[in-house]
Structures are given as structure tokens and as C-alpha cells.
Amino acid sequence: MGGDFQRRLVLLFGLLSLPCAAEPPGIWLDVPFVKQERNGCGAASVAMVMQYWQRQRGKVADASSDARQVQRALYAKKAHGIYASDLGRYLEQHGFRTFAFHGEWSDLSQHLENGRPLIVALKPDANSVALHYVVVAGIDAKRSLVFVNDPAERKLREHEWSDFRREWNATDDWTLLAVPREGASSAP
């Protein structure tokens, strides 16, 4: 009986010493995950970034950062989603400064190192005009990985850099940075 207990104890300590796979290596931010509704990836991505900044400032998420509200405010039937320019406009109206640009790996690294998640547009299907917005929440340069909060799937979805780059390049590497405007009363 004593030997059985010792084997279990050794096994337990052995398991506890294994590296934890819950957190990806490299740089990553704990951006809240918001699941999208139909054609709601843009709204969910805006909500994730707004909620991230509200949490950073110790505030509770408010109605403006609710994905359903963003979707109601911005959804365009013709686009079957939200236009990129409207994402930035909504964030501006709610206390953020926004910067849309053609991103590169160095931009992902720089902004994540400074605690700033990015919204990017991807084009998963080259034969479709549909875009898909995700939030870049982490990278691992050593393993050439990008981690995104994909509102259609899950938090910290792993992409090989080459696959991510192909889908991102199809949108001309569209990237949106949103940072709280200092002193804005409606800023999170």
C-alpha cells in the first residue's frame, strides 16, 4: 500500500513539473473573447478591443462595447457585415484614437509589446469577396506563429505566419489600431 502511494505521489509531482500549455510562448495580451453573431466579426472585434481597454483602466464593460450594439449601429446589408471605415468611426465616437494602416510583422510585434491589440482584416477564401475581422492578441517569432481572437472560433487561435500572411496580404494587410483618447469622458 505504501509503495502505491509513493508511486502516485511521484507521478503527481512529475505532472506538476511539466510545462503548462495553457499560455502560448512569445508575446500575448489577455484580450477578452467575444463570440460573433452571423456576419458579426467586425462588431465582435470592436467589442473585444473596447473591453480590453476598459479592463486595462479598471472599468466595467459598458453598453457601447457590447457586440450586439455595435452590430446594430454599423451593420450594412450590402456588405453582409461592417465596412472597415465604420469600425474606426465607431471607435472614434466612443473615445478612441484610431489608425488604419498597411501592417507588417514588425507592427504586430511593436504594438503587442506595448500592450496594444490590433484588429486586422483577413480574406480566408481567395475566391470570395468576404473579409473576416480578427483581433491579433499575440505572436511567437521563434515559431513563426500569430495568435488571434477569432470571433467565429475561439480565443488565441494559432495561425502559421505563412497562412496568416497570405490571408492578410489579400486585404492589403489592413490593420486598425485603437487606443483610448486621453482625457476623453467616454473613453473606457
Regions found by a protein language model. Name each.
Residues 2-6, 18-80, 84, 105, ...:
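Active-site-adjacent structural segments surrounding the nucleophilic cysteine of cysteine proteases
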Residues 9-12:
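N-terminal export leaders
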Residues 23, 89-92, 167-169:
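Short, conserved catalytic or adaptor-binding loops enriched in Gly and charged residues
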Residues 97-149:
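Active-site-adjacent substructure of cysteine-protease-like catalytic cores
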Residues 70-105, 109-118:
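Mid-length scaffold segments of soluble, non-membrane domains
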Residues 26, 79, 113, 117, ...:
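Noncatalytic regulatory segments and standalone regulatory/sensor domains
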